[in-house]
């Protein structure tokens, strides 16, 4: 509803209701309605403007109020309120309006309250019109209502009055600030303030026309004015009024302080005055502060002290006020040191009743405080003074300590509703006092920290030094410059730190809630930090020592010590160091009895593990170090000792039991909700983690420290490590008697504290540490060094701290009297630091880098064991130190080994020392481990970092390798170390220069002298020869495997890396290395050892040396031929080889053969011929013959392998290739070759059947060479003949023997024709051809007994077939050459060849005597034999009539005759072929003995047919001599068949003949039928007998008819 509508409605109501009752009112109402109707269409703003100019419009409402017309009062009041809200009242009517309202208040409560509601609205909108007369009217209304007995009205009136006063002063203050001050308004406000003061002091005020006001209400009004308008009271008139009118009231009230409501309000006003008017009211405030100090020090009521302490808490939370107070009082000569006295009073309150607050109980109270705090509002407090309590002022419970239950829920100074003073727990007073001290500390710290950050470290340090030297003038500027504030704060801290220390020490020793303890410790951190930044060393050390003793208290130390160590502790359970400072001595006596009285009866005096409070103390220390570590200086020592002790105890605490049971205490209140032990355990875990994290951050932040600060940090840390580990245990002194520190002079106190600060607070750490425990300081040192790696690269190494670190740590682990675990930890610490620092190593070739690497590896070299130890424990420690050092070296090399350019000598010295002394110091097992670990470093160097070494380093490296090769703890290490010589040699090879040695070195001594004198100028070639000398020395003076490995590596190096050596270098190698090897002990004394294993080892070494020397000569012949005396060296080598060449040393023998072969091969490949080369060939050839002679004749070696034989033959092959030897020399060599080929003791190879063995290949190569180069075909044919004869002798046909030379024989069969071609006559003349034919007859005779020609290819023809074919081809070749030379009539040659042919024919035709074996073959290869038979017969048939062959022709045909039979009998007499009729008759007359055996069929029936056919063909030939020779042979053959038939038939009877017998008889019948001339008497006789025998059987066969016909024909012929 709009203003117009509301006013219209209200006026209409008044108008209607008053028509008949009140004409005056109706008239006034009509006038107002008329005004509204007139301005009906105006806007609201225009309407308001019109209303302000029309005073008559308000008269209806004022009339109703003035006449107290009750029925219209509310409508009128509503209208007035509506007009005031819309600012539509005219200022001119305010006085009459307030008079009308004064009349209304007499009507009742509702009217009164409505009036009190309207008045502030009017005052707000018309503050400029609130002149004193009007204010008087308002005050009269309010005071009248305030005096009402109705409390509602009274309180509302008081509130309205307060609001009016504030509105008035607010308006004045606003105008003052806007420079629009009006004199009347100013004077009215001042009169109002004075009037209020007069009301309080005199009970009435004429200016306000008020004769009474309650003191409490008046003070509240004054507080309202002061608290909101302190800038207004900077005006002199107001300041004078405060001084003259208000302060007397306050002073008077302070003098009595009996009424709590008054005292409360006085305290609040004092707080305002202290906050805002201390500058203008200095003298008065000094008096008031003196009174407060007196009250705090005297036995005043607790509620009074609480009020003052709450005021002080507010004051000290204002840093600027603190600065002003110090400037006005403490810092101003002639003034009282107000702040110092206040701080002292606060400290006294804290220490006044230690038993009440549980000092010494070490109890953490459980509060309703989750995650450190949980206020009723749900937000955690931000500071100690903002912690909300739960104490309501009733009778306090018996609570020992300070927690929420002992802190007032509503501060005493805010309890306006209380008429009687509340009950104040003494713990609350202590809490307030500590809040004030904490506020001072926190306020100063906040300012100092910000200023320190703003100006920087350097400027701040200069400022503090100026303040200390009194060169800083704080009065040069009247303004509160930051520098002036810093000076004041410095003075405040330096003058009052003892009081702070005492208060802090007592408070943190109390039974506190977690949140209070944390807030207090936070303040403690700030205070110590400020002392540190101000350079106040004595206060800093005293504070740190106190906190350290509380972090690791005496009972915790004694609980973790052994019984013997605990005996050193004083009777009260505290280490003597706990009373080191006078402050502690003071507290000791003052708090012990009270603490024991409040202590839990179940508390274990010897606490084993940390409680929550100790963890919080530790975290406090870590926070201090984190905040001001750079300025800590010597204070680090205290911290490090404490961290060490704490770490030992923490590591002993079980994971699940961080908190001892005695560290928890609950408030005895059933109405309180507290945390269980699980919550505290979680809290403690969190604090532990935070503590460790802060320590980690502390270490990392050291990287930003300045160099002096860093060095102080480092020196303190190392001093703690050294003193705790090495120095003897100091005698603990007894606790000193307590004394009052106030009685000490400043100089005396400083002396006491400085002496105490320089004394170690951790004297009991060595008593505390148990076996196997180490100090946390080592870990700190490691981390700090890791964070400050760049410092170590400083060119000024003395300033980097590196020498100090290495020296201090080495002092710990080098002294055997130090505890083993500490020695090990110190070594490990140094190793870890070295590994971290190694990451900064650079390969920059600069003096700085050189110096740093030298000192770095020198420090690494310190990690060596002490050898003069005897007990097992010390040996174990030395072993650990060695292991640590070597592992560090491995890690360094793996990480940055490629950057290491200097300091290698320390590395090699370290490796040699461990290798030489490992077994001696640690025993064989651990010694082997050390050797392996050290060798891993050496191996890494030799594989990756050889390029970083200079020449002197190489000498150290080779000496180190020699040590590892000769050690006996680990064979694998020795062998691998030998192999590393190869890596070194390969690197040196790449460094070779093009220049040769200036001279040849003939002795090792000369070489050593040169390298030692000119180590920096030595050529890589000289180093390389030194390496070879080392290896040669290993070949002589080391155990077997190493000797062998050294020999192998030595000659590998020779062969692969010596191609760039000059003549003098080679001469040096020959004299210093090869000759040394030839005269070495393993070779020269190989036969002198007694042990078979040693003999084998020496033999193996000799083999390697022999083969190696041969390889050297072979691979480098072109260079060596230019070296003087090289043949003498080679001859020396041959003499050695021959001396050792025997059955006793088979390995040496084979090495000799290999050496010969290598030398021979190299000679064959050498393309340049000169005198030296020729001498070399002859030398080798002669020694080859010697070896053959020794092997096959003189000593007759019985175990030469096929490989050795092959090597021998290959050697001579290569020699023959290289030089044109004479025929006699070649013949002699072939004699030795035969011995090698036919060496029966050699193992045979079954695979020779299909493949040429190495020996056969060598023989083949030799024969090819003899044919191609020397044209000595006859020698080759002789050799082949011998091979065939040897290969197929009777001994080779037994089944237990393996075939040999089979494949070579097949090669001979294939190539013989080519060798013989065009040389047959020559070979016949030499007898070579006959020898060849005879050798071919050997396998032909064996026939089926020959070994298989192939085990792979079954289609390969048998050996005898191949031999037969070869025989035929050679025979044809001979005939060809004979005919070509017209020597076909040469009787001697023809006779010789025919005899060989007869024997060959016999071998082709006749099977072996072992028929059962022969005829069991699946294939008899008859076709091949038939072919060979025919070829030979056709070759000789034209020449059979020669007279020279007459004697051999009969034998030839007898051979054919024997091959013509179709069967054979096993157990009967052999067939006899007669050559005369008389012999035939005799043979026919002799009957065969009947046999029941079955005949063996001749599977070669074609042979039989062809042989018989040849006989018949030649019988019918034109050569009479031949025909006459054949006739008796055929007749004898026919007779034998008939006799056999008669004998077999007489036994078989009815049984039929075998097929072979039938074929044989059919052949006989056919022959007789076709050749009647063959009939003779024996044949007549046998035919008749056969016929009768056949007819005796009743079974008729076709044979019966044939025999019948033949018999009939026989009879006819016989009759003729």
Curated annotation (Swiss-Prot):
Q: Where in the cell is it found?
A: Golgi apparatus membrane
Read off the InterPro entries from this record.
Answer: ARM-type_fold, DCB_dom, Mon2/Sec7/BIG1-like_HUS, Mon2_C
Pfam families associated with the record: DCB (PF16213), Mon2_C (PF16206), Sec7-like_HUS (PF12783)
Record keywords, A-Z:
Golgi apparatus, Membrane, Phosphoprotein, Protein transport, Transport
Residue numbers bearing the Phosphoserine modification: 43, 660
Q: Does the keyword Transport apply?
A: yes
For this record, an example GO cellular component is:
Golgi membrane
Q: Give one GO molecular function term.
A: guanyl-nucleotide exchange factor activity
Superkingdom of source:
Eukaryota
Please give, as recorded in its UniProt entry, the membrane topology of this protein.
Peripheral membrane protein
Picking any one GO biological process from the record gives: intracellular protein transport
**What family is this protein classified in?**
Belongs to the MON2 family.
User: What assembly does the database describe for this protein?
Assistant: Homodimer.
Role played? Required for traffic between late Golgi and early endosomes. Required for endocytosis and maintenance of vacuolar structure.
Annotated protein name in UniProt: Protein MON2 homolog
């Amino acid at each position: 509803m709009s203003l117009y509508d509301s006013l219209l409605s209200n006026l209409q109501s008044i108008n209607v209701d008053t028509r008949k009752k009140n004409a005056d009112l109706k008239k006034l109402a009509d006038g107002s309605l008329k005004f509204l109707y007139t301005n009906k269409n105006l806007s609201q703003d225009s309407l308001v403007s019109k209303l302000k100019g029309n005073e008559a419009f308000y008269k209806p409402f004022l009339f109703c109020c003035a006449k107290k017309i009750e029925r219209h009062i509310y409508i009128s009041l509503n209208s007035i309120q509506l007009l005031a809200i819309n600012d539509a009242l005219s200022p001119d009517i305010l006085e009459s309006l307030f008079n009308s309202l004064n009349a209304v208040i007499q009507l009742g409560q509702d009217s009164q309250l409505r009036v009190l509601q309207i008045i502030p609205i009017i005052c707000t909108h018309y503050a400029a019109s609130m002149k004193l007369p009007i204010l008087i009217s308002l005050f009269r209304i309010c005071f009248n209502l305030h005096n009402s007995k109705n409390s509602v009205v009274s309180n509302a009136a008081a509130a309205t009055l307060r609001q009016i006063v504030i509105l008035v002063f607010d308006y004045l203050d606003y105008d003052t600030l806007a420079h629009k001050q009006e004199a009347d308004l100013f004077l009215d406000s001042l009169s109002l303030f004075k009037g209020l003061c007069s009301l309080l002091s005199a009970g009435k005020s004429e200016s306000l026309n008020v004769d009474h006001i309650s003191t409490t209400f008046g003070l509240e009004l004054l507080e309202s004015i002061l608290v909101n308008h302190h800038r207004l009271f900077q005006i002199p008139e107001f300041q004078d009024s405060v001084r003259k009118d208000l302060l007397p009231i306050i002073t008077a009230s302070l003098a009595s302080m009996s009424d709590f409501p008054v005292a409360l309000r006085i305290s609040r006003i004092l707080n305002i005055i202290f906050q805002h008017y201390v500058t203008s009211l200095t003298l008065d405030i000094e008096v008031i502060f003196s009174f407060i100090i007196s009250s705090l020090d005297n036995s005043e009521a607790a509620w009074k002290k609480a009020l003052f302490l709450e005021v002080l808490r507010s004051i000290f939370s204002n840093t600027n006020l603190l600065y002003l107070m110090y400037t006005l009082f403490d810092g101003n000569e002639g003034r009282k040191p107000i702040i110092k006295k206040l701080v002292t009073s606060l400290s006294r309150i804290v220490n006044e009743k230690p038993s009440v607050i549980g000092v010494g109980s070490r109890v953490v109270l459980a509060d309703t405080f989750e995650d450190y705090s949980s206020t009723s509002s749900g937000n955690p407090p931000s500071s100690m003074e903002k912690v909300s309590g739960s104490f309501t002022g009733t009778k306090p419970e018996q609570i020992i300590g300070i927690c929420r239950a002992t802190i007032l829920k509503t501060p005493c100074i805010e309890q306006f509703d209380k008429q009687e003073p509340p009950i104040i727990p003494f713990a609350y007073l202590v809490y307030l006092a500590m809040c004030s001290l904490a506020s001072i500390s926190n306020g100063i710290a906040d300012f100092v920290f910000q200023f320190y950050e703003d100006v920087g470290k350097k400027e701040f340090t200069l400022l503090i030094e100026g303040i200390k030297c009194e060169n800083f003038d704080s009065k040069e500027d009247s303004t509160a410059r930051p520098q002036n504030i810093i000076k004041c704060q410095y003075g405040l801290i330096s003058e009052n730190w003892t009081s702070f220390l005492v208060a802090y020490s007592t408070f943190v020793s109390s039974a506190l809630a977690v949140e209070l303890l944390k807030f207090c410790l936070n303040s403690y951190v700030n205070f110590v930090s400020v002392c540190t930044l101000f350079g106040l060393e004595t206060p800093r050390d005293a504070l740190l020592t106190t906190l350290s003793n509380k972090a690791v208290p005496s009972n915790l130390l004694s609980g973790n010590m052994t019984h013997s160590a605990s005996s050193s502790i004083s009777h009260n359970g505290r280490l003597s160091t706990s009373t080191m400072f006078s402050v502690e001595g003071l507290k000791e006596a003052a708090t012990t009895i009270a603490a024991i009285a409040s202590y839990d009866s179940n508390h274990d005096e010897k606490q084993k593990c940390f409680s929550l409070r100790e963890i919080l103390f530790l975290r406090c220390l870590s926070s201090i170090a984190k905040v001001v570590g750079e300025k800590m200086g010597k204070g680090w020592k205290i911290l490090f000792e404490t961290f060490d002790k704490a770490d030992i105890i923490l590591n002993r605490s079980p994971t699940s039991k961080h908190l001892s049971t005695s560290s928890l205490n609950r408030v005895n209140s059933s109405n309180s909700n507290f945390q269980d032990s699980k919550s505290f355990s979680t809290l403690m875990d969190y604090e532990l983690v935070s503590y460790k994290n802060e320590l980690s951050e502390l270490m990392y932040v050291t990287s930003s420290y300045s160099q002096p600060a860093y060095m102080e940090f480092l020196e303190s840390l190392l001093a703690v490590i050294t003193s705790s580990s090495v120095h003897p245990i100091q005698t603990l002194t007894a606790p000193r008697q307590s004394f009052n520190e106030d009685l000490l002079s400043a100089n005396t106190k400083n002396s006491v504290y400085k002496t105490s600060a320089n004394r170690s607070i951790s004297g009991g750490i060595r008593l505390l540490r148990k076996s196997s425990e180490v100090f946390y300081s080592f870990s700190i040192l490691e981390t700090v060094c890791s964070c400050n790696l760049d410092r170590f690269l400083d060119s000024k190494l003395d300033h980097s701290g590196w020498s100090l670190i290495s020296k201090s740590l080495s002092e710990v682990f080098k002294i055997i009297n130090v505890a083993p675990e500490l020695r090990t930890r110190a070594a490990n610490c140094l190793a870890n630091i070295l590994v971290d620092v190694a990451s900064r190593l650079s390969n920059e070739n600069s003096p700085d880098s050189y110096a740093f690497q030298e000192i770095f590896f020198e420090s690494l070299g310190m990690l060596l064991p002490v050898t003069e130890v005897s007990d097992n424990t010390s040996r174990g420690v030395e072993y650990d130190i060695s292991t640590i050092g070597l592992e560090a070296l491995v890690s360094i090399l793996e990480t940055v080994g490629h950057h290491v350019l200097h300091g290698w000598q320390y590395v090699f010295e370290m490796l040699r020392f461990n290798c030489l002394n490992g077994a001696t110091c640690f025993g064989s097992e651990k010694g082997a481990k050390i050797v392996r670990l050290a060798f891993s470093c050496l191996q890494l160097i030799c594989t990756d970092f050889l390029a970083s070494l200079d020449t002197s380093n190489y000498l150290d490296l080779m000496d180190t390798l020699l040590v590892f090769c000769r050690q006996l703890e680990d064979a694998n290490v020795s062998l691998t170390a030998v192999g590393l010589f190869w890596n070194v040699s390969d690197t040196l090879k790449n460094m070779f220069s093009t220049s040769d040695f200036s001279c040849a070195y003939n002795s090792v001594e000369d070489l050593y002298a040169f390298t030692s004198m000119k180590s920096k100028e030595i050529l890589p070639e000289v180093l390389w020869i030194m390496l070879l000398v080392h290896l040669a020395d290993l070949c002589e003076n080391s155990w077997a495997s190493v000797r062998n490995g050294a020999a192998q590596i030595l000659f590998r190096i020779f062969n692969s890396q010596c191609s760039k050596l000059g003549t003098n270098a080679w001469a040096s190698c020959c004299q210093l290395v090869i000759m040394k090897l030839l005269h070495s002990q393993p070779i020269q004394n190989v036969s002198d050892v007694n042990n078979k294993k040693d003999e084998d080892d020496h033999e193996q070494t000799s083999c390697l040396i022999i083969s190696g020397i041969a390889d050297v000569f072979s691979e480098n012949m072109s260079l060596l031929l230019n070296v003087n005396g090289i043949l003498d060296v080679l001859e020396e080598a041959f003499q050695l080889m021959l001396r050792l060449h025997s059955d006793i040393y088979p390995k040496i023998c084979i090495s000799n053969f290999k050496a010969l072969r290598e030398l021979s091969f190299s000679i064959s490949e050498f393309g340049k011929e000169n005198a030296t080369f020729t001498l070399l060939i002859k030398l080798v050839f002669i020694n080859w013959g010697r070896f053959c002679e020794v092997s096959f004749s003189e000593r007759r070696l019985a175990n030469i392998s096929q490989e050795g034989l092959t090597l021998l033959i290959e050697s001579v092959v290569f020699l023959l290739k290289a030089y044109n030897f004479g025929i006699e020399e070649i013949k002699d060599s072939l004699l030795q070759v035969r011995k090698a080929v036919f060496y029966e003791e050699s193992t045979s190879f079954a695979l020779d059947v299909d493949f040429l063995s190495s020996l056969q290949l060598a023989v083949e190569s030799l024969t090819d060479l003899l044919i191609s180069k020397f044209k000595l075909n006859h020698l080759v044919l002789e050799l082949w003949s011998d091979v065939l004869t040897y290969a197929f002798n009777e001994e080779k046909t037994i089944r237990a023997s393996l075939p040999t030379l089979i494949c070579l024989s097949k090669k001979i069969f294939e190539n013989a024709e080519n060798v013989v071609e065009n040389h047959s006559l020559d070979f016949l003349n030499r007898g070579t051809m006959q020898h060849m034919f005879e050798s071919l007859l050997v396998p032909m005779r064996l026939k089926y007994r020959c070994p298989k020609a192939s085990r792979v290819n079954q289609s390969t023809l048998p050996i005898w077939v191949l031999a037969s074919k070869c025989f035929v081809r050679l025979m044809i070749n001979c005939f060809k050459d004979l005919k070509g030379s017209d020597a076909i009539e040469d009787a001697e040659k023809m006779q010789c060849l025919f005899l060989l042919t007869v024997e060959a024919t016999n071998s082709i035709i006749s099977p072996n005597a072992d028929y059962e074996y022969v005829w069991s073959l699946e294939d008899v290869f008859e076709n091949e034999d038939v072919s060979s038979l025919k070829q030979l017969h056709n070759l000789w048939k034209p020449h059979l009539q020669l007279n020279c062959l007459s004697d051999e022709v009969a034998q030839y045909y007898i051979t054919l005759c024997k091959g013509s039979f179709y069967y054979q009998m096993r157990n009967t007499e052999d067939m006899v072929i007669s050559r005369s009729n008389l012999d035939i008759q005799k043979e026919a007359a002799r009957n065969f003995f009947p046999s029941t055996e079955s005949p063996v069929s001749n599977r070669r029936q074609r042979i039989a047919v062809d042989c018989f056919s040849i006989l018949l063909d030649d019988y019918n030939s034109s050569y009479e001599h031949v025909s006459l020779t054949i006739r008796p042979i055929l007749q004898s053959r026919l007779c034998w068949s008939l006799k056999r038939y008669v004998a077999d038939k007489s036994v078989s009877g009815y049984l039929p003949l075998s097929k072979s017998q039938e074929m044989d008889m059919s052949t006989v019948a056919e022959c007789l039928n076709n050749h009647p001339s063959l009939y003779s008497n024996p044949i007549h006789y046998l035919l008749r007998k056969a016929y009768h025998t056949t007819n005796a059987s009743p079974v008729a066969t076709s044979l019966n008819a044939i025999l019948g016909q033949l018999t009939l024909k026989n009879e006819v012929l016989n009759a003729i």
